[in-house]
Amino acid sequence: MTAIARRHRTTGAPAAVMAAVLLSTTAVTLDACSAGPGGPRLRVSGAYVPRPASPDVAAAYFTIVDSGDSADELTGVTADVSAQAMMHQSAAGTMRMLERIPVPAHGRLTFAPGGYHVMLEHPVRSLRQGDHVRLTLRFRRSAAMTVDAPVEPIGYRPETSR
């Protein structure tokens, strides 16, 4: 065996160990979003906060997708910029506070203007376009998930702005 062949062989073993460690870490991270085999498998995407027109209140929007075989429930949201974050549903000119919202199995729950939203009462700092808000979503069955929501311009709509 040549010196070059030996060198590749010895560096191959540590590389294989490192790959195994990285793969096992990734598996743990993905399982943290589920309640186990046959349970919900949640993913959050598209989180954003439109720059508020008033310094007293802001709203957060996102989508939760459950690719698992069981439903779950969103039971609460906290935000790093507000002592009080409340889930609401707007419909027919009214708004009502909700304590939990179902996330259907093999379905999605969308928070968007005119429907579900998280009301961020009295932000502790002024929110400007380009800032970020950390949201932590709590579920009945699945582990809590933290997402980073960028502050977008007033009137921002993901389907038309990107």
Predicted regions and their residues:
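Compact, glycine-rich, soluble single-domain proteins
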Residues: S34-R162
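Short, intrinsically disordered, low-complexity terminal/loop segments
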Residues: M1-I4, S161-R162
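C-terminal motif of bacterial Sec signal peptides marking the signal peptidase cleavage site
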Residues: T29-A32
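Bacterial N-terminal signal peptides that target proteins for export
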Residues: A3-A20
